[in-house]
Amino acid sequence: MRNLKSVTPLLMAALLWGQSLLAQASLPDFTALVEEASPAVVNISTRQKMPERSVAAQPGLPDLEGLPPMFREFFERSIPQMPRNPGGRQREAQSLGSGFIISADGYVLTNNHVVADADEIIVRLSDRSELEAKLIGADPRSDVALLKVEGKGLPTVRLGKSDELKVGEWVLAIGSPFGFDHSVTAGIVSAKGRNLPSDSYVPFIQTDVAINPGNSGGPLFNLKGEVVGINSQIFTRSGGFMGLSFAIPMEVALQVSEQLKADGKVTRGWLGVVIQEVNKDLAESFGLDRPAGALVAQVLEDGPADKGGLQVGDVILSLNGKPIVMSADLPHLVGGLKPGEKAEMDVVRDGSRKKLKVTIGTLPEEGQELAAAGSTKGGERSSNRLGVTVVELTAEQKKGLDLRGGVVVKEVLSGPAAMIGLRPGDVITHLNNQAIDSTATFAKVAQELPKNRSVSMRVLRQGRASFITFKLAE
């Protein structure tokens, strides 16, 4: 027993030491990666000349021009309405960001929002030398910008394939958060293919790498030391890092940069549809086994989809053999196609599968807005089953809204219509997968709606169409 007691502490110490070594062995060592990659990561500063706000002096407030600089800054921060610069002079706005060199002759990738509207762009290298950069082109839709500095034999990063990234894989960022050059942070890939509301054409890489203002435009590396993304956005309620960072995949950035280098702009494929997500109730309503695909809520007249035979209510399941798992997958795939290219789609229509061929168009510079419905005249019908009163669309409204049919909600009573959020002025174009061309059709379809089953309704509100679902109780 004495021998056992004396051995036990030694065994425990050995076990703890072994666990410590195992933990250390499982954590990556980033030192070699950082030493190799850092020289090609740059700090980007911009200057923009802006007219000073010229505000007339207000009673009880001093003129800032007559104050010492220290007091002037205090009043500017504390009292936004403080009059400043009555002479109308220009002031200089500055911003900081990051970037990385992709070619030895000086091409640099960064974010569009880092250099947007800049009058001067300065790139500072790791040796603290500064070079003036020329903006070759920028693409607001992907938030990618391509710069050029004069130089030869510049250090460059190695480019990797972001589509080979796996969730849970270690990644590392180098950038200039809050101006602190070449700060290194690490984390893991949290998710892939994230769609953000303001960016329909980028399937973002989500990470938990600490990203802060100033990191924008900097590289995201894998453990091989290859750039797999451009750090672009964070989700935050405080203005700082909260564990949700988003990077532009390198494949997207390279496609954009190649077009910017060749043409100074980006041309994307376009289908001419408005789509929405397919949830469980919509899947049941449209005869799908499970939620999948992109539901066509709107088809632009004479657009590529319209000419190819796509209809409102179709569910697009694949494009050129690539599955559409989420509706956000479709814009990414279509945007990557060249205008004039033929594309094959698998769609579900009225519960049956169909194949359609569409000639891809060119994405317009700006979206086309549809006018909202106004007051109406014509026949009036009420549906007690839905709790709604509808009236006919006028010819002028049909033309203005680019519609062939539909009815306008005049009054919403208690019932399913109120529960799903219908409002007066909404235009109902489809009910239970049937086109509504008149108030009589609406009343007939509403009367025949099934009970205890998801029913879809297509609604146009302020120019935007979407499908909503509801169930009628027994």
Swiss-Prot record:
Family: Belongs to the peptidase S1C family.
Active site: 113 (charge relay system), 143 (charge relay system), 216 (charge relay system)
Signal peptide range: 1-25
GO molecular function: serine-type endopeptidase activity
Keywords linked to the UniProt accession: Hydrolase, Periplasm, Protease, Repeat, Serine protease, Signal, Stress response
Gene3D superfamilies (alphabetical): 2.30.42.10, 2.40.10.120
Binding-site list for substrate: 214-216, 271-275
Single GO biological process annotation from the record: proteolysis
PROSITE patterns xrefs: PDZ
EC number(s) reported in the record: 3.4.21.107
Chief location bin: periplasm
Reported function: Might be efficient in the degradation of transiently denatured and unfolded proteins which accumulate in the periplasm following stress conditions.
Reactions catalysed, as given in the entry: Acts on substrates that are at least partially unfolded. The cleavage site P1 residue is normally between a pair of hydrophobic residues, such as Val-|-Val
Pfam families in the cross-refs: PDZ_2, Trypsin_2
Protein's cellular compartments: Periplasm
InterPro entries given in the database record: PDZ (IPR001478), PDZ_sf (IPR036034), Pept_S1C_Do (IPR011782), Peptidase_S1_PA (IPR009003), Peptidase_S1C (IPR001940)
Name of the protein described by the UniProt record: Probable periplasmic serine endoprotease DegP-like
Principal EC category: hydrolase
Boundaries of every PDZ domain copy: 260-351, 357-463
Signal recorded as keyword: yes
